[in-house]
Amino acid sequence: MATHSHPHSHTVPARPRRVRKPGEPLRIGVGGPVGSGKTALVAALCRQLRGELSLAVLTNDIYTTEDADFLRTHAVLPDDRIAAVQTGGCPHTAIRDDITANLDAIDELMAAHDALDLILVESGGDNLTATFSSGLVDAQIFVIDVAGGDKVPRKGGPGVTYSDLLVVNKTDLAALVGADLAVMARDADAVRDGRPTVLQSLTEDPAASDVVAWVRSQLAADGV
């Protein structure tokens, strides 16, 4: 597991932060393509942080509650701390264009659980253009994996380029699919304007140590 950053600058669009009310939890989005390992990462974050924080999770699926069901089955949090939105259409619409259903679900989680510290919002599987509305989350993680080949970071796209943290997942499979991790790290650094990139394998590090450390840094900056 390695963290990479690259100091040279690019012109990037400003991403305004949402205005939070006093006492509102930090909200971190977890997005990325289908099968990249978003739900497994959310599960790992819950396992590592549930002993120190008041947590909740909100998942997005098109027609099912598959991801929420997975998290409940694996008991990463009590069932009532895991909610699901069925988007009924393109996953990015519910996290970027019309976030009403997600905001309503967040309100319900906050009403049910006083003094939440953190809500993880997992998007449905989408492509490299998916990003979260700044009205929905305070920071966003974008997850890709090596199965798509080492060209994926080079292709860029808003998720790869502008997410607050890029995670290159399933690094243990790199040799099997012919992906060069050094190339992926280099190409990610080249487009991310110094934003951090983590290369990880949940098989080798089930605790997702580098991502957990990043989440803790976001919470510390937030005063949690």
Curated annotation (Swiss-Prot):
Domain of life of the native organism: Bacteria
Compositional bias per record (Basic residues), positions renumbered to this chain: 1-20
Molecular function as annotated in GO: GTP binding; GTPase activity; nickel cation binding
InterPro entries: CobW/HypB/UreG_nucleotide-bd, P-loop_NTPase, UreG
Binding-site residues for GTP, renumbered to this chain: 32-39
Subcellular location: Cytoplasm
Function of the molecule: Facilitates the functional incorporation of the urease nickel metallocenter. This process requires GTP hydrolysis, probably effectuated by UreG.
GO cellular component entries: cytoplasm
UniProt similarity note: Belongs to the SIMIBI class G3E GTPase family. UreG subfamily.
Keywords: Chaperone, Cytoplasm, Disulfide bond, GTP-binding, Nickel insertion, Nucleotide-binding
Origin species: Mycobacterium tuberculosis (strain ATCC 25618 / H37Rv)
Coiled-coil region list: none
Main subcellular location: cytoplasm
GO-annotated biological processes: urea catabolic process
Quaternary structure note: Homodimer; disulfide-linked. The physiological role of the disulfide bond has not been proven in vivo. UreD, UreF and UreG form a complex that acts as a GTP-hydrolysis-dependent molecular chaperone, activating the urease apoprotein by helping to assemble the nickel containing metallocenter of UreC. The UreE protein probably delivers the nickel.
Name used for this protein in its record: Urease accessory protein UreG
CDD domains (alphabetical): UreG
Gene3D superfamilies registered for this protein in UniProt: P-loop containing nucleotide triphosphate hydrolases
Chain spans, region Disordered: 1-25
